[in-house]
Amino acid sequence: MKVVGNYRVNTANSSTDTSGEHLTCLRSQLFVAYRNGRVDEAVSLGFLDCWIGGDLTNFKGCYLTNQLPIQIFTAIFDMNTDVIILSQFMYYRLKNQKKKMIFQPQLFKDSITREKVRLSLWGVLCPVYIPYSFR
């Protein structure tokens, strides 16, 4: 125990001992996601962006304020974890997107309906195109 002012601080249970917990959470997250193959449906990209932004801010703050090396190491570890989870998210999103494209039927099977939809989309996206398209 260390005495700081009028308070005693137990340094054995400090908050820097959480890197083992981070590793356990990462390992279980990666294993369950690999087994299910549904990471893209469980987590949103916006959530991952906020999570990465928070960890990036944490690393930047630790580095710029000259924190303890263990804090900088933990921040780097968190950033690496975020990169792994984001790459896993993108991999399964592309993989599952290809599966969905194979099994989805075509919406407009005949060419006349496709042409009408294309012309109406051009009318919505480019209003200048409307007067010249029907002459």
UniProtKB/Swiss-Prot annotation:
GO terms for molecular function: L-lysine transmembrane transporter activity. Gene3D superfamilies: 1.20.1280.290. GO terms for cellular component: lysosomal membrane. InterPro entries: LAAT-1 (IPR051415). It comes from the Eukaryota. PANTHER family: SEVEN TRANSMEMBRANE PROTEIN 1-RELATED, SOLUTE CARRIER FAMILY 66 MEMBER 1 LIKE. This is Putative uncharacterized protein SLC66A1LP. It comes from Homo sapiens (Human). The lineage of its organism: Eukaryota, Metazoa, Chordata, Craniata, Vertebrata.
